[in-house]
Swiss-Prot record:
Binds 2 calcium ions per subunit. GO terms for biological process: axonogenesis involved in innervation; cellular response to glucose stimulus; cellular response to potassium ion; mitochondrial fragmentation involved in apoptotic process; mitochondrial transport; neurotransmitter receptor localization to postsynaptic specialization membrane; postsynaptic density assembly. Cerebellum, hippocampus and cerebral cortex. This is Neuronal pentraxin-1. The gene is Nptx1. GO terms for molecular function: metal ion binding.
Amino acid sequence: MLAGRAARTCALLALCLLGSRAQDFGPTRFICTSVPVDADMCAASVAAGGAEELRSNVLQLRETVLQQKETILSQKETIRELTTKLGRCESQSTLDAGPGEARSGGGRKQPGSGKNTMGDLSRTPASETLSQLGQTLQSLKTRLENLEQYSRLNSSSQTNSLKDLLQSKIDDLERQVLSRVNTLEEGKGGPKNDTEERAKIESALTSLHQRISELEKGQKDNRPGDKFQLTFPLRTNYMYAKVKKSLPEMYAFTVCMWLKSSAAPGVGTPFSYAVPGQANELVLIEWGNNPMEILINDKVAKLPFVINDGKWHHICVTWTTRDGVWEAYQDGTQGGNGENLAPYHPIKPQGVLVLGQEQDTLGGGFDATQAFVGELAHFNIWDRKLTPGEVYNLATCSSKALSGNVIAWAESQIEIFGGATKWTFEACRQIN
């Protein structure tokens, strides 16, 4: 009788195992386990199989992470090849240009000569286009390296969705870019063809930026809301960021930010604030060969900033409506001051605050020649004049540094458009 009971026990246990593992597609194994006569045999079998499932999931996760790393390394190698090809194209374009053609089309738009929008792409020579594309690809390479490092440090949180995005979204865009580069390498098109090719390449690169941004969203959930930067890789009239909040009426202000750019001539417009009836209510701009300027109610003061060396710089501008007194700080040190800048004119409320573009109309009217090219982070605004000590704390990343009481740098408050991107940045850890 005991033998019959044991046989029935094993049979029931086998049935429980078959039910609990019905979703497995591998071979089924049967395990007989001694349990008390009055115990729940199905529950015991599930507990015994739980450890095995956990081990299987861990092994699968490790395999996924390894595949992700291999995919990222493959993308980095592809970008190196693209950069090499672009270099060869640029060299060939220089050799093909005649003595009088080497610098043609390279002049910057003068005021009043019309906007350099995407419809005017043929104004930029091929060598400059290829140089910009090379810089953009280098930026993509850096961001892929950041993704690789993030994957290595946070492998336990990776999923198959990241792998799928890496394979399906980066691969097809890189094939498009490679095709465009080969076209440039093999033939010499006329101005119309050059314009079309550049437009197609920039469109592909913009899409690639957007799709890499989707991958970088995996980092966003695991970082503080202020540990990010904005990147504007190309000088266009459609790439920008918008601050969701507007400004109140202000009789004094301090605006501070971190900037990194090597654009020349002129880094462009880090930010602009427009209100109904006045597009230049508050603007910071460096255009052409002019020095950087601050505009308040269309009144101008020249600032002593020199920041287009490809390094991170912290800049601040303070202003009070009384006598229009202003001060300018670079890297924590005051470099200039003045007065009579829009005196007794308060900053008007209910406007539109844009990062990366100069507004000719409320919320729009962007001009590609005035666009900011580079990286921007920790944009803060206060409704008072900060002291030199407070500015220094910001520039040195002191624990005493303050966040803006009007506009504080927060990822949830910034919307990006046209291929501008957000990715992780910690001031003073990544600078220079």
